């Protein structure tokens, strides 16, 4: 689909131009992070891997009759990230109620709709609901070797899962795992333990590994657990990496952890354009082999 401007749609007002996505409104940046403004997407410099993670809130913001369809804006946002790997959570495969409500609801699953030209979309459902299903997705401009899904549901009230995708990045295999952990602290601990067992079972010890997503963790317990498994992220010294809630971020719930790669920097886009699209802000990280 053509994406030439940001659009906003609600049931009441219909589609209208919002504003141009670029340049991003950013109040805080890292010197190592540059997001290009050119429209065509060339791969970054050799051996530099850019990974983004984004909880897209199922492509809809707001409640009741004032809710807005943001999936078109999110498509532009993903394109402008210019990432090698984009890890998405709360991605709808389909939803009959929303498709009937919004005139501009895409006629393809959200993962396919959000994938920029030349990218491959890999999706797996975590949750089945009355009107549809949603889960995790990974978008990449590099060849996909294999992919698999594992159920991580810890109790019957939350359906969770991990998506594992192996991509061939500049001739080297890189493993990426997309996660969306539970709301209960004990569940998250058990899910991290399950993640570790999955890594030990499915991923070669020396292979570069990325684990990204919405960890739903307001503290540092999971960070310590992941560090004990050899997974680390870029350590920021200020509040520039807070991602939730998008309008006034108080915590960094979204992370990109790696093994076998060197973290170089993080970037969290700021501003009204971004907090209107989802309840989370995206997080973009760069790594060096």
Which residues are covered by each model-predicted region?
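Solvent-exposed loop/turn segments connecting transmembrane beta-strands
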Residues: 130-131, 155-159, 185-187, 275-277
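A short, structured active-site edge motif that brings together acidic residues
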Residues: 117-130, 148-153
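Beta-strand-turn-beta hairpins that frame and shape the catalytic cleft
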Residues: 42-51, 134-136, 140-146, 158-178, ...
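Metal-dependent phosphoester-hydrolase catalytic domains
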Residues: 10, 24-39, 166-168, 197-209, ...
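Conserved beta strand-loop-helix elements of the APE1-like EEP
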Residues: 115-118, 131-146, 249-264, 287-288
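Active-site environment of divalent metal-dependent phosphoester hydrolases
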Residues: 58-61, 93-96, 129-132, 184-187, ...
């Amino acid at each position: 689909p053509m994406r030439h401007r940001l659009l906003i749609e609600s049931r009441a007002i219909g589609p209208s131009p919002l504003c141009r996505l670029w340049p991003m409104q950013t109040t805080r940046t890292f010197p190592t992070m540059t997001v290009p403004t050119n429209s065509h997407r060339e791969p970054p410099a050799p051996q530099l891997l850019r990974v983004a993670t984004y909880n897209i809130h199922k492509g809809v913001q707001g409640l009741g009759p004032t809710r807005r369809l943001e999936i078109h804006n999110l498509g532009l946002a993903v394109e402008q990230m210019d990432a090698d790997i984009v890890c998405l959570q709360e991605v709808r495969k389909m939803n009959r109620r929303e498709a009937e409500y919004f005139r501009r609801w895409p006629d393809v699953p959200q993962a396919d709709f959000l994938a920029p030209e030349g990218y491959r979309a890999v999706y797996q459902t975590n949750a089945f609901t009355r009107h549809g299903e949603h889960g995790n997705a990974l978008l990449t401009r590099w060849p996909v070797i294999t992919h698999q899904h594992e159920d991580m549901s810890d109790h019957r009230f939350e359906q969770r899962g991990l998506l594992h995708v192996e991509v061939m990045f500049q001739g080297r295999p890189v493993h990426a795992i997309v996660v969306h952990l539970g709301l209960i602290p004990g569940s998250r601990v058990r899910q991290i333990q399950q993640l570790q067992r999955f890594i030990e079972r499915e991923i070669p010890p020396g292979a570069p590994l990325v684990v990204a997503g919405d960890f739903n963790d307001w503290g540092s317990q999971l960070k310590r657990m992941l560090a004990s498994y050899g997974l680390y992220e870029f350590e920021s010294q200020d509040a520039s990496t807070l991602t939730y809630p998008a309008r006034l971020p108080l915590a960094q719930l979204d992370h990109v952890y790696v093994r076998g790669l060197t973290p170089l920097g993080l970037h969290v886009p700021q501003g009204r354009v971004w907090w209107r699209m989802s309840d989370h802000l995206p997080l973009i990280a760069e790594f060096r082999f």
